[in-house]
Regions:
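Adenosine-phosphate binding glycine-rich loop
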Residues: 468-492
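Glycine-rich adenosine-cofactor-binding loop
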Residues: 338-378
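Structural motif
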Residues: 346, 439-440, 462
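Glycine-rich phosphate-binding loop and adjoining beta1-alpha1-beta2 segment
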Residues: 376-412
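Glycine/serine-rich phosphate-binding loop and adjoining beta1-alpha1 elements at the start
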Residues: 134, 146-344
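Domain-level detector for trafficking modules
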Residues: 81-136
Length: 492
């Protein structure tokens, strides 16, 4: 590997070879690489960046997504193709030639300046606003789409569930995940009945919402830069809401409105989608006791014109933004959804061993919404190398362990269990139940008795009897009628 002092000389020489660039702060060693500051004068635009080069260059930064040289300036957050940390987002072709790749990346930066700084190009895909979130803490609220029924200036209460409250890493960084449950106007998030039931067993709190309709952008700033101070946000909020918030913060909001000494306010606005638009929501945290609003008494003349006794002014304090993510079903399974004929079916899986547990997980990851699993057996150590269970599941029934796993994968799954063999039931009654409630049966029991039962009942559901032969030499899938007779062709 090249000596570090020689690498610094090489980097400086390459930068100086482009007359549009000027080194403002000399290239120097840092942990894991090299850094400096450069200025670029290009097409009449004058910009400056911190430049960071990994010591492995021309290889990429370790643990990064194809990033090699970083050009960074937080003042440019809000412009197109700028990451949350202020770095320019582009992915250069991989090249093992140091000089050639370095000069190419300088050209890529120029291309970004032309397209996104000067021409202010807008990409087809919507770019979410980047907010300055609270340091040393991570809060994220998850939600689903609604039916676009909110009106500008509408405000009220919403409910959310504290899904997890954990500490991460050696520094024990607090990581909190929340799921929105719905609004006080009976608009509910579209989680499955099973998942919503579990959410309601958690610590549930109330927050406030305000529908802005338009993005909360800083005015007279190049690009789409998010508002960062309360007095700027005041231009988007009605006096009625500020009065509601002022009185609530003084006395009306009880402990049910605070989690970890913070009140949650979500602000909603329209963003485009492939059909028309949808509502996006951003999270703001208000610390208990924080003095955000001042009430000013109006003169008599002002009272008549404004029909109010007070006007409410927000302070210039920095907004404490959390983060949010829309995980609506359409997004959650956007890249891996199975055909709707499968996902919309009511499915019964008989047998939750190696085959049944794996099939169940594949179906759930593919977007299946309604599932019943059946198995009478418990989990033993020898099951773990073949089936989708872990050490904590041992001793317990297979259905219990599998349901726990499946529910941890999808918030859109309704799942039920049967902990007994199918021969436990009266077959005539079982047939009536299956014909009414089940569309597809996957028999993964590898039990000939199960094919006897299915043949006897002759259910209307589509039936697939699956098995793996001894020593895992073959996978067998039998469907249709006369399952027992067909199975004998393979196993006798």
């Amino acid at each position: 590997m090249e000596d570090k002092s020689n690498t610094i000389k090489r980097i400086s020489t390459l930068i100086n070879s482009d007359t549009d660039f000027k080194i403002l702060k000399d290239i120097h060693n840092i942990s894991g690489g090299f850094s400096g500051e450069v200025e670029i004068n290009y097409l009449g635009a004058n910009l400056s960046f911190q430049i960071i080069i990994p010591e492995q260059y021309p290889l990429t930064h370790p643990n990064s997504d194809n990033i090699s040289i970083t050009f960074k300036n937080e003042d440019y957050i809000g412009l197109g193709h700028i990451n949350p940390d202020g770095s320019v987002c582009f992915h250069p072709d991989k090249d093992d030639d140091f000089n050639r790749k370095f000069l190419y990346e300088l050209k890529c930066l120029k291309q970004w300046i032309k397209e996104y700084y000067i021409l202010e190009k807008e990409d087809d895909n919507y770019t979410y606003l980047i907010h300055k979130t609270e340091k040393g803490k991570f809060d994220r609220l998850y939600f689903t789409n609604m039916k676009n029924e909110f009106k500008q200036g509408e405000f009220g209460q919403f409910d959310y569930s504290v899904f997890s409250n954990e500490k991460f890493g050696d520094d024990k960084i607090p990581v909190n995940k929340y799921f929105r449950l719905g609004f006080d106007n009976e608009k509910q998030d579209k989680w499955s009945e099973s998942f919503a039931k579990d959410l309601n067993k958690n610590n549930c709190k109330k927050g406030l919402y305000y529908y802005l309709e338009e993005e909360p952008l800083r005015k007279s700033i190049k690009g789409r830069k998010s508002i960062e101070n309360w007095n700027e946000l005041g231009d988007y909020l009605s006096n009625d809401f500020l009065e509601f918030l002022y009185k609530g913060l003084k006395s009306n909001f009880g402990n049910n409105f605070f989690f970890d000494k913070s009140l949650f306010l979500i602000v909603g606005y329209k963003i485009p989608n492939e059909h028309s638009y949808e509502e996006h929501w951003d999270l703001i945290k208000i610390n208990k006791g924080e003095k955000l609003i001042e009430a000013k008494k109006l003169s008599k003349a002002e009272r008549k014109s404004q029909n109010n006794y007070f006007t409410y002014c927000l302070s210039n304090q920095e907004i404490k933004w959390g983060s949010t993510e829309n995980i609506d079903y359409s997004r959650f399974f956007g890249r891996g959804k199975l055909h709707s004929k499968i996902t919309d079916s009511n499915i019964l899986i008989v047998g939750c061993g190696a085959l049944g547990s794996s099939l169940a997980e594949i179906l759930v990851r593919g977007g299946v919404k309604n599932l019943v699993i059946e198995d009478f057996d418990s989990i033993k150590g020898g099951n773990l190398c073949r089936a989708n269970y872990d050490l904590n599941d041992m001793i317990y029934p297979k259905t219990i362990g599998l349901i726990k796993r499946l529910k941890s994968i999808s918030p859109f799954l309704n799942v039920k269990q049967l902990n007994v063999k199918m021969n436990h039931f009266d077959l005539e009654k079982l047939k009536v139940f299956i014909d009414k409630n089940v569309d597809v049966i996957f028999d993964c029991s590898t039990d000939p008795e199960m094919t006897f039962i299915l043949d006897e009942m002759d259910v209307s559901a589509d039936v697939f009897s699956m098995a793996i032969t001894n020593n895992a030499k073959s996978f067998i899938n039998i469907t249709g009628k006369d399952l027992t007779k067909k199975a004998k062709l393979f196993f006798d």
